[in-house]
Amino acid sequence: MSLFAKLQQRAGEGRPVRVALIGAGKFGSMYLAQIPRTPGVHLLGIADLSPDGARANLARVGWEPARTSATSLTDALKHGSTHIGEDWRALVSHPAVDVVVECTGHPIAAVEHCLAAFAQGKHVVNVTVEADAFCGPLLARRALQAGVVYSLAFGDQPALICDLVDWARTCGFPVVAAGRGHKWLPHFSQSTPDTVWGYYGLTPEQAARGGLNPKMFNSFLDGSDGVAGAFHHHVHRRVADQRAPVLADVRAAVLQRVGQRGG
């Protein structure tokens, strides 16, 4: 199967895959950098709490302002451009949208976005892996009930791990363990958003140019990332949501105590 050939075919037939993107921050901008170079894909709209921030990220990855000049989703559909706004519900419910890419990095919001997309019959690519760590199987069940596809982003670590496991089993190798390792030293727990860039070998100016969020990157470093809490890994005691339960109902699968997680 050639994904590129299939996308070329859709482009030639004038029926591109129409995408709705929720969240145009650091991770969203990585995808935005690809879209102008990918045939057969039309980014119909972007929903972000900061439309101006989304436009700044689009400019950073090389988008021309004319590409996002649409005054509405209907206008974007008519002219093949992209609309930027704050109303994610309007974006998810638009009849022309084929797939929703959830890219907020906020696990609770991501669950709500996924459920709303399923209810509208939309496929979902969930880049917010923290949401999947908390209640991925339940989200997958809801997608199955709705008759749509729920997937993580291929290229991100969880999806690549699954791909490697599938490859190994197909080759006849027994897989006894699978996971993603990350270097962690005890003094990393002392990192704060004000000091984090030194651990990554970056200056604050370099991080700012790249649109990097110090709170988010600090959560990767100091052990307070939501994924660690979801899997009951040992993390620093200050993290209030350590061992937060994942409840039976996906709508209730939220942190029961306020935790520290950079968005």
Regions found by a protein language model. Name each.
Residues 36-40, 59, 63, 93, ...:
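Generic secondary-structure signature for well-ordered alpha-helical cores
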Residues 231-234, 243-247, 251-258, 262:
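Hydrophobic, low-acid, alpha-helix-prone terminal segments
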Residues 1-116:
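N-terminal glycine-/serine-/threonine-rich beta1-alpha1-beta2 phosphate-ribose binding loop
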Residues 49-51, 105-106, 129-132, 155-156, ...:
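Short, ordered loop/turn segments at secondary-structure junctions
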Residues 143-147, 151-225:
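Rossmann-like NAD(P)H-binding beta-loop-alpha module
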Residues 109-120, 129-148, 153-156, 164:
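Rossmann-fold NAD(P)-binding glycine/threonine-rich loop
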Residues 1-8, 205-230, 237-238, 263:
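C-terminal catalytic/substrate-binding lobe primarily of soluble NAD(P)-dependent oxidoreductases
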Residues 123-125:
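A short hydrophobic/small-residue beta-strand
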